[in-house]
From Swiss-Prot:
<dbReference type="InterPro" id="IPR000100">
    <property type="entry name" value="RNase_P"/>
</dbReference>
<comment type="similarity">
    <text>Belongs to the RnpA family.</text>
</comment>
<protein>
    <recommendedName>
        <fullName>Ribonuclease P protein component</fullName>
        <ecNumber>3.1.26.5</ecNumber>
    </recommendedName>
</protein>
<dbReference type="GO" id="GO:0042781">
    <property type="term" value="F:3'-tRNA processing endoribonuclease activity"/>
</dbReference>
<dbReference type="InterPro" id="IPR014721">
    <property type="entry name" value="Ribsml_uS5_D2-typ_fold_subgr"/>
</dbReference>
<comment type="subunit">
    <text>Consists of a catalytic RNA component (M1 or rnpB) and a protein subunit.</text>
</comment>
<keyword id="KW-0255">Endonuclease</keyword>
<comment type="function">
    <text>RNaseP catalyzes the removal of the 5'-leader sequence from pre-tRNA to produce the mature 5'-terminus. It can also cleave other RNA substrates such as 4.5S RNA. The protein component plays an auxiliary but essential role in vivo by binding to the 5'-leader sequence and broadening the substrate specificity of the ribozyme.</text>
</comment>
<dbReference type="Pfam" id="PF00825">
    <property type="entry name" value="Ribonuclease_P"/>
</dbReference>
<dbReference type="InterPro" id="IPR020539">
    <property type="entry name" value="RNase_P_CS"/>
</dbReference>
<dbReference type="GO" id="GO:0000049">
    <property type="term" value="F:tRNA binding"/>
</dbReference>
<dbReference type="GO" id="GO:0004526">
    <property type="term" value="F:ribonuclease P activity"/>
</dbReference>
<dbReference type="InterPro" id="IPR020568">
    <property type="entry name" value="Ribosomal_Su5_D2-typ_SF"/>
</dbReference>
<keyword id="KW-0378">Hydrolase</keyword>
<dbReference type="GO" id="GO:0030677">
    <property type="term" value="C:ribonuclease P complex"/>
</dbReference>
<keyword id="KW-0540">Nuclease</keyword>
<dbReference type="GO" id="GO:0001682">
    <property type="term" value="P:tRNA 5'-leader removal"/>
</dbReference>
Length: 119
């Protein structure tokens, strides 16, 4: 689980990311991101009912949290990042989600330059 300080928690914080941030989309994910005034990154996760039943939505969120945790140290600091799952994500594999996350984060320039080689 992500630390409390590493999570976007209130609707005001989510709204700030959506209104002031930039958006990039991939096959399975849409990422909204904006700089924050903190010394760390914060992440939020959204899965809507188009994805499927609650069991599937919760599984997707757990998998996305695991991906974020794995690459958290390689992301540039001082950003609020919201991951929105797209409708086709329920049929994808964990590896497919991970590749999509890496591709979008690279495109956004959110990985630190000194990050380990990311495939």
């Amino acid at each position: 689980m992500l630390d409390k300080k590493a999570r976007i928690r209130t609707s005001r914080e989510y709204r700030n990311v959506f209104e002031k941030g930039k958006r990039l989309s991939g096959r399975f994910l849409i990422i909204y991101y904006v700089e924050n005034a903190l010394d760390n990154n914060r992440f939020g996760f959204i899965t809507n009912k188009k994805i499927g039943m609650a069991v599937i939505r919760n599984r997707i969120k757990r998998q996305l949290r695991a991906i974020v945790r794995e690459y958290q140290g390689q992301v540039k600091n001082k950003h609020d990042i919201v991951l929105v799952a797209r409708a086709g994500i329920g049929k994808s594999s964990f590896e497919g989600m991970e590749k999509d996350y890496i591709a979008i984060m690279k495109k956004a320039g959110l990985f630190a330059r000194n990050a380990n080689k990311i495939d």
